[in-house]
Amino acid sequence: MLRTSIATSRQVLSSPVCPKASAQWLRSSSAGRANTTTRRHYAILQEPNGALRSSSSPSVAAVSDVSQRASNSTNTKRPNTSDLNLRSAASPSTGSTLKPETVLVAPVSPPRQGQTSPGSAASAPEPTAAPPPSPPPTPPTPKTGRLRRFLLYLFLTTGLAYAGGVWYSLRSDNFYDFFTEYAPYGEDAVLYLEERDFRNRFPNATKKNNRRAVTPIDGGAQVTIPGGSGLSWKVAEEQQEGSDISKKGPHMSAVDKNKATKDTKRVEKTKGGVTSKSPAQREEAVKTKPATEGVKTQPAKVEETPREPAIPAVTTIDHLVLNTEDEPVVQDLLKVFNDIITVISADAPSSFSGPVAKAKEELEKIGKRILALKSDAQASAQKEINDAHASFDKSAAKLIRRIDEMRAEDATKFREEFEAERERIAQSYQEKINTELQRVHEVAEQRLRNELVEQAIELNRKFLSDVKNLVEHERESRLSKLAELVSSVAELERLTAGWSDVIDINLKTQQLQVAVDAVRTTLENSNVPRPFIRELAAVKKLASNDEVVSAAIDSISPVAYQRGIPSSAQLVDRFRRVASEVRKASLLPENAGITSHAASFVLSKVMLKKHGSPAGNDVESTLTRAENFLEEGNLDEAAREMNSLKGWAKLLSKDWLADVRRVLEVKQALEVIETEARLRCLQVE
């Protein structure tokens, strides 16, 4: 966004926005006098009774009231005159155009009795009779001042809006554009405030203490063209000198000509790189060309020695260039040095050309040395890296070879063991599954065969009865029972579709029973706890729409089907080990120490083991009853007996109780699923 300079804003702000108001009281006084002098007056008539009567409608009091109001409206001090006929003539300074002789003198009514006018210059003669009382003066109409108030408010509102616009223009560029474009003198006001703010923040900005002297730009020698010719005075002088062959000049001697030529060549050699002429020299060459062509009739050719330019050619110092783009330090140093050369070239390049050339040579040497050191360092580093890579490759190859050999041996061994175990397990499970599937298929096929036979018999019976009825009714009317035939066919189709649904339900129930049996077989025949996630997932998939089966599966702990559950034999074996440890801690109190543990361990060796079904709540009786329940296969009662223990005995049997609970949860879930499968079969039948 472009803004005008601050100097222009000063000039605009220094000039007044509106012309200066002139003095108002002179014009008001002259206007009052003009109104007074132009007012018409009437003669005073005397009535027969001796009273004076004025024929004019306005009374003297009204006239004085009007003059008083005119004097008050001007807000200036005027002479207190109560008599209108003694008014002084207008002075020349008031600027009035009326002459004193043309002013009409208004008659003055006689003053009231007992009233004198201290400022009057003359008094009227007293009448013979008292004048009638004059009517009371009309009260002046109060001025509302509505226009004055409106102008005052308008001026204040405009001033506040203008000041707010100037303030907001300093903070918003968009509003600045709008304000400076449409508001009068808006741009000047904003620039003035910006200048004031700049001067407040930077009071020393206008001082010239630290400013560098700026060298004026030399635009070349000024050429003055005379009014009568388009050529310069130098060329005109040379033409006059060349036109006079008799005068002494370079054409009079060939030696001088050769000398001038040699000097010219020497000067051109010393200049070296300066090959182009300045614009002033080219203009002089163009202007002198027609002058020399006009003197072809001379016996000797006139040649001028090249003049030295008025201002010597400015020779700049070339910047230093090094091919070190990948060295930031050298580039920074080169940039600083080139900046110094730029400053020297702008000021005095000839005086510093020697030191700058030496500095250039030193910097070039330094750059070459840095590049050489860098190349050597890179070569040595690359060699070390290559050696390290070679050694690492050898070590890695050896390590990989050894790891591959070990991995191959382990893989071969594990593969053989896995294949053998997988074949054995697959064979055993395949035999069991084949047996179960064969039995289930036989039962299902036999059941379906019986049901189909029953359905066929029933359908044949119905069909025969229907045919008989149709034949009987056909005798009466061949097409009378066509609707009944259609309904019978629809009923037949419905029955067929219903039996297909029954068959599907039976198949799903059989598959669910087989999946439950597979889970139970997996749990009973495993020697170690084995996860049964796959079998349980098959059960859940077959009974995806049954809420009871889903709830039973969800009641099983994830630890049970992820890690497996122990068999009954494993539970009994582990119970015996736990029972021995519980007997050792049976005599320990709750807060027992090392001595109590030792005493309990010793006394447990002496205690006699109970047999049968002993009664009592002691630890030995509880262990005996739990063992009996385990031998009978009643895990629920055994868990109840072990759960009744307290203290250290219950703490030691906590893990065993957790395993028993998981086993009971799984068995209970399987029983619920089997019951649900039987219930489905009953519902179908």
Curated annotation (Swiss-Prot):
Q: Where is this region: Disordered?
A: 47-144, 239-306
Q: Which superkingdom is the protein from?
A: Eukaryota
Taking the record's annotation, the residue ranges forming a coiled coil are 356-379, 405-451
**Where does the record place Low complexity bias?**
54-67, 116-127
Q: Where is the composition biased (Pro residues)?
A: 128-142
Topology relative to the membrane:
Single-pass membrane protein
Give compartment(s): Mitochondrion inner membrane
Q: Where are the transmembrane segments?
A: 150-169
Q: Which residues lie on this side of the membrane: Mitochondrial intermembrane?
A: 170-685
Q: Where is the composition biased (Polar residues)?
A: 68-99
Q: Which UniProt keywords apply?
A: Coiled coil, Membrane, Mitochondrion, Mitochondrion inner membrane, Transit peptide, Transmembrane, Transmembrane helix
- Biased-composition ranges, Basic and acidic residues, are 254-271
Please provide, in alphabetical order, the Gene Ontology terms of the cellular component aspect for this entry.
MICOS complex
**What functional role does this protein have?**
Component of the MICOS complex, a large protein complex of the mitochondrial inner membrane that plays crucial roles in the maintenance of crista junctions, inner membrane architecture, and formation of contact sites to the outer membrane. Plays a role in keeping cristae membranes connected to the inner boundary membrane. Also promotes protein import via the mitochondrial intermembrane space assembly (MIA) pathway.
Q: How does it assemble?
A: Component of the mitochondrial contact site and cristae organizing system (MICOS) complex.
Q: Which family does it belong to?
A: Belongs to the MICOS complex subunit Mic60 family.
In its UniProt entry, what is this protein called? MICOS complex subunit MIC60
- Native organism is Paracoccidioides lutzii (strain ATCC MYA-826 / Pb01)
